[in-house]
Swiss-Prot record:
It is found in: Cytoplasm. Zn(2+) 1 binds at residues 552, 555, 580, 583. Residues 66-83, 95-126, 189-212, 237-246, 254-270, 304-313, 319-332, 412-421 have a biased composition (Polar residues). Pathway: Protein modification; protein ubiquitination. Its EC number is 2.3.2.27. Residues 37-48 have a biased composition (Basic and acidic residues). One of its GO terms (biological process) is positive regulation of cell population proliferation. It is an enzyme of class 2 (transferase). This is E3 ubiquitin-protein ligase MARCHF7. The RING-CH-type zinc finger domain is required for E3 ligase activity. Coiled coil: none annotated. It catalyses: S-ubiquitinyl-[E2 ubiquitin-conjugating enzyme]-L-cysteine + [acceptor protein]-L-lysine = [E2 ubiquitin-conjugating enzyme]-L-cysteine + N(6)-ubiquitinyl-[acceptor protein]-L-lysine. Its main location: cytoplasm.
Length: 704
């Protein structure tokens, strides 16, 4: 991830070197000190779990003010503003100086500061030298060792700030765990710290007399105590992660009393547990967001089929217990006693909300208790059936298979053939029959019979299928005169989702459930023979030629006038024997205009005999010759245009050659080109004469 340079929101506190400069600072910033000490957005919190942010500015080190929690309430704001000048010489300027660090891995285990304004609004500093370091288990051991050593120094700082009673702190405490959706970072076991890999720079501390709390070496950077140094030794390469400086007006105060406070171990363990919980919440939110973005209906269905078969070995199982399974106290493999699994399974709500009609199982427990289905044995015996994508592509194949297996799958004996039932079947080794009568009065009486039939159809010990019962009563009564048959893949078991392709075979009401065949007596009646006889007679009357007379084979009309009589042009007989004169003229003209040869025009297409035509004012040979001349002229014009273009190109090339050289060979080439064009024109004229005589209009142009 490419880091982007951004400015770190921080607070700069100035350390005056004398009381005069301190008064000038407090006088000029009288109103801003209250905002500095008591602003909500920039307040720090000294928490039981200290989180460090070792940051550096490449130009100059920045100092962030360090505050500890105290019992001062909000009313102390005005008191601190009024008394800040009086206690200027008594109040220690305790500040945290963040320097460029080369030992950031040890600094991350100690005092940790957390600014709610920078973390809450996701304004994490992204400078080019920032590296997000994640520490492993070896740093966890080092953290426990260093926490024992830093308790004394931390308590010393806390007591030192508490001794100055006028030092008012912010009463606003930031939230324990910021919201992950707003970009805040969790306080986890990974102990992510911000380490700036900048080169160590020379810093000259601004005060003449100051006390520096520095680490002795890079390993024990947080075992520190206050030591006084002179101003000439303040110029140094600051490699420790933090240096704590406090100054008074007159002389430095060296605090050597180290007080040991109670161990922070219980708070750390509770914070670790809270960190684990927050991590699981984050993972669950990520999973739920990924479900709406990356999961389609088909992929979620395939993942559901896979997870339902392999839920015994999975850490978090998305299988949902139905209401009937929880009512009959049947243990499921998806029940994990660990609290982590129960919390982490919340991330798979996208699988839980896709169950279509599972809520109906609570209302129909009386029907679903009598219907059993073993999902686990079905998954082990039959194995995964076919994926939904393959079933969607092979719908006709499976429909035919269901129709062939209708005899074996229907086992409900019914005494009354007029009773209308809805049977839901599964295409597997086990067949579940659920029957619901359309008659509301006879429904209660027929339920025990359907329950007995369904229990005899299933094999082995099984769990009750409440989702099927809910769907049974929901669909009964839609089409009372037909029978529904639902085919579901066995890999899903009782978990019937709305994604599953449900094929419905609508069978006529005359279907006999005992033998699985349609009733022959209730089939559609055959056609009336008298009606068929009438149809045949009407067709014969329409085809009679005696009443209508002779018809033209082109326009199917009789002779209308003496000028347009019916003729017999060829040896065709029957209904194709007669043709109108005008119809024949039009047909021959169309054949000539199509470019057919004279022989093709004068031959019948049906009997392949030569036409015998004695038409007035219609000469086939003359019409064909005229059309051939028109075609020749058109082709000559087209070829002439082609030759003109070719001649122009030749002249241009000749002028270019004449401009370049005056050799006799170029002149000879031009003369040969002119002769070639003249010969080509003569060939065109001779080809036109031949086409008029022979009727062949296919020419080839040979250009030398």
């Amino acid at each position: 991830m490419e880091s982007k340079p951004s400015r770190i929101p921080r607070r700069i506190s100035v350390q005056p070197s004398s009381s005069l400069s301190a008064r000038m600072m407090s006088g000029s910033r009288g109103s801003s000190l209250n905002d500095t000490y008591h602003s909500r957005d920039s307040s720090f919190r000294l928490d039981s779990e200290y989180q460090s942010t070792s940051a550096s500015a490449s130009a100059s080190p920045f100092q962030s003010a360090w505050y500890s929690e105290s019992e001062i309430t909000q009313g102390a704001r005005s008191r601190s503003q009024n008394q800040q000048r009086d206690h200027d010489s008594k109040r220690p300027k305790l500040s945290c100086t963040n320097c460029t660090t080369s030992a950031g891995r040890n600094v991350g285990n100690g005092l940790n500061t957390l600014s709610d304004s920078s973390w809450r609004h996701s304004q994490v500093p992204r400078s080019s030298s920032m590296v997000l370091g994640s520490f492993g288990t070896d740093l966890m051991r080092e953290r426990r060792d260093l926490e024992r050593r830093t308790d004394s120094s931390i308590s010393n700082l806390m007591d030192y700030s508490h001794r100055s009673g006028d030092f008012t702190t912010s009463s606003y405490v930031q939230d324990r765990v910021p919201s992950y959706s707003q970009g805040a970072r969790p306080k986890e076991n990974s102990m992510s710290t911000l380490q700036l890999n900048t080169s160590s720079t020379n810093h000259q501390l601004p005060s003449e007399h100051q006390t520096i709390l520095s680490s002795r070496d890079s390993r024990n950077s947080l075992r520190s105590n206050f030591s006084s140094r002179e101003s000439e030794s303040s110029r140094s390469n600051t490699q420790p992660g933090f240096s704590y400086s406090s100054s008074r007006d007159e002389a430095p105060i060296i605090s050597n009393s180290e007080r040991v406070v109670s161990s922070q171990r219980p708070f750390q363990e509770s914070s670790d547990n809270e960190g684990r919980r927050t991590t699981r919440r984050l993972l669950s939110r990520i999973a739920s967001s990924m479900s709406s973005t990356f999961f389609s209906r088909r992929s979620s269905q395939d993942s559901l089929n896979t997870r339902s078969l392999n839920s015994e070995n999975s850490y978090v199982s998305p299988r949902i217990l139905t209401a009937s399974q929880s009512r009959s106290n049947v243990p499921s493999a998806s029940e994990v006693p660990d609290n982590r699994a129960s919390e982490a399974s919340q991330g798979f709500r996208f699988l839980r909300r896709r169950w279509g009609l599972s809520s109906l199982s609570h209302n129909h427990s009386s029907e679903s208790d009598s219907e059993n289905f073993n999902q686990e044995s079905e998954g082990r015996n039959t194995g995964p059936w076919l994926s939904s994508s393959l079933r969607n592509r092979c719908t006709p194949l499976f429909s035919r298979r269901r129709r062939e297996g209708r005899d074996e799958s229907s086992r409900i004996p019914t005494s009354d053939t007029s009773s209308r039932s809805h049977i839901f079947r599964r295409e597997s080794n086990e067949v579940v029959h659920l029957e619901a009568q359309n008659d509301p009065l006879g429904a209660a009486a027929n339920r025990p019979q359907a329950s007995a039939a369904s229990s005899s159809a299933t094999t082995g010990g099984s769990t009750s299928d409440s989702a099927q019962g809910g769907r049974n009563t929901g669909i009964s009564g839609i089409l009372p005169g037909s029978l529904f048959r639902f085919a579901v893949p066995p890999a899903l078991g009782s978990n019937l989702t709305d994604n599953v392709m449900i094929t419905v075979d609508i069978i006529p009401s005359g279907w006999n459930s005992a033998d699985g065949k349609s009733d022959k007596t209730k089939s559609a009646p055959s056609r009336d023979p008298e009606r068929l006889q009438k149809i045949k007679e009407s067709l014969l009357l329409e085809d009679s030629e005696e009443e209508e007379g002779d018809l033209c084979r082109i326009c199917q009309m009789a002779a209308a006038s003496s000028s347009n009589l019916l003729i017999e042009p060829c040896k065709c007989t029957g209904s194709l024997q007669y043709v109108h004169q005008d119809c024949m003229k039009k047909w021959l003209q169309a054949k000539i205009n199509s470019g057919s040869s004279l022989e093709a025009v004068t031959t019948c297409e049906l009997c392949k005999e030569k036409l015998e035509l004695n038409l007035e004012d219609f000469d086939i040979h003359e019409l064909h010759r005229a059309h051939a001349n028109e075609q020749a002229e058109y082709e000559f014009i087209s070829s002439g245009l082609y030759l003109v273009v070719l001649l122009h190109l030749c002249e241009q090339s000749f002028s270019d050659m004449m401009g370049n050289t005056n050799e006799p060979s170029t002149r000879v080439r031009f003369i040969n080109l002119a002769r070639t064009l003249q010969a080509h024109m003569e060939d065109l004229e001779t080809s036109e004469d031949d086409s008029e005589e022979d009727g062949d209009h296919n020419r080839t142009f040979d250009i030398a």
